[in-house]
Amino acid sequence: MDSISCLKHEAHLKKMVLVIVFIALFLDHMLLSVVVPILPSYLYNTDQDATSTPGNGTDSTNDPPIIHSVSNSRILASTFASPSQNLDLSSSTYSEADADLDTVNIKVGLLLASKSTIQLIVNPFIGPLTDRVGYHIPMCAGFCIIILATTLFAFSSSFILLLLARSVQGIGGSCLSVSGMGMLADVYKDGTERGRAMGISFSGLALGLIAGAPFGSVMYQFVGKMAPFLVLAIIAVLGGGLHFLIFQPLQAQTEREKGTPLLTLLRDPYILIAAGAICFTTLVIATIETTLPVWMMKTMSASKWQLGIVFLPDSLCYLIASNICSRLSQKYSRSWLWACIGMAAAGITTISFGFSSTIYHYIVLNAFIGFSSGTVDSSVMPLMGYLVDMRHVPVYGTVYAIADVAVCIGFCVGPVIAGPVVASVGFPCLMSIIGTVNLIYAPLCVFLFSPSWQGEPMVRAGRKIYLQNTFVIHTTVTSAYLQREVPLFGMTPPPVEWK
């Protein structure tokens, strides 16, 4: 009877972990995108208020006419762009625009790029921290930091405070993403369950990206700047409170085993291949988001609604792929194959961007990019947890910090190289280069088909176990240690050796 109640409690715990990680990723990525339609107009208005005088008749209560002539492409193009890149786009594409808009574009680029930069710096510290203190304390801290960031966004009226809010969000986002992925890998030991759980959690990520910009624009237009951020702050309070109430009794745990050092994981070729797949597919998205809007304006005089709708299939197809491919890749133990197919599809699709000329082509191609990226992420993320199970100590914070660093590198490097390359060789050549890189890298995923096992002795409950092809499941709820054999990637593990 006790064992049945224990299993029920463990199943309930898994569902609660999944709900909390879903909320965490949804919140972080909705805050990532909700500022996109708000910041340009708000910064322009504040700059105009600062430079206007009472006698010049400037009306600072409404958006100046010039702000309405700036399409969403400037926002999208500056999402991860460098300041010099945004300045070039401003001068070449909108020569008739007000000169102050160039300054606004630089500020927007700095603001939106600061999160990925801070997250890139913080991730190597968050990963080992979660391995040392567990996942729940960083998760709780992440919710608290996001509450602080949303509050700063709501009440900030200067560029410096907005930059501080965006940087704080990077710290909170790092805590949420690293600890969230680690929690899922820790409680979902079965391959199929883990893949399905991570696919559902990625749905929260995609929904946040889809809902963020429309929600922000509507709330900003009809309620004001503070409203969307206060709503997100309330969601953060609810998510953090739910997490605290559920997992507070679990703080009294048995001694936590020491995770594998960061440098050791970075020397693992399989983990590097998996992280590279995530990085290069992210590089595709970051580069396209930066350069496609301006290319559409130059070649087809795209309108505002066209520049906004062209990226919608990206997130929608990412949402679909993350649920479908995560289940298929784990059900048939073919994560490496789906990752290889996803990268190859992303490469071919990226090259096709340079040969397209209508909005319908771009919509279809963005749908393929979203599906390809979702396929790679939903296949590789669970795989990184398996690699730690197979080759290292099964503590997951550091390995998912590496995965998050790979995402941040893609979003930081993509826009930086996009501007100079487009200026020198053009948009079609840039797409061909990025696509070819993905096509060349895709075959490396084949090496993930049968990674070698790496036995590592660990002391648990006073007994030394040599991990070869065996999972040892640590359940913090019951403080019990279950040992079972789980075949992965078509391999049958030999019996465990007890010392």
Region annotations inferred by a language model:
Residues 121-156:
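Conserved MFS/SLC helix-loop-helix module at the cytosolic interface between two early adjacent transmembrane helices
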Residues 122-134, 321-334, 422:
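Helix-to-loop junctions at the C-terminal end of transmembrane segments
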Residues 144-157, 344-357:
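C-terminal ends and interior cores of transmembrane alpha-helices
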Residues 201-247:
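Helix-loop-helix hairpin linking two adjacent transmembrane segments in secondary transporters
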Residues 134, 155-160, 189, 301, ...:
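Helix-breaking motifs and short loop linkers at transmembrane-helix boundaries and internal kinks
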Residues 165-204:
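Cytoplasmic helix-loop-helix junction between adjacent transmembrane helices
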Residues 35-37, 271-312:
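Extracytoplasmic gate region of multi-pass secondary transporters
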Residues 2-12, 249-275, 462-479, 483-488:
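Juxtamembrane intracellular "pre-TM" segments in multi-pass secondary transporters
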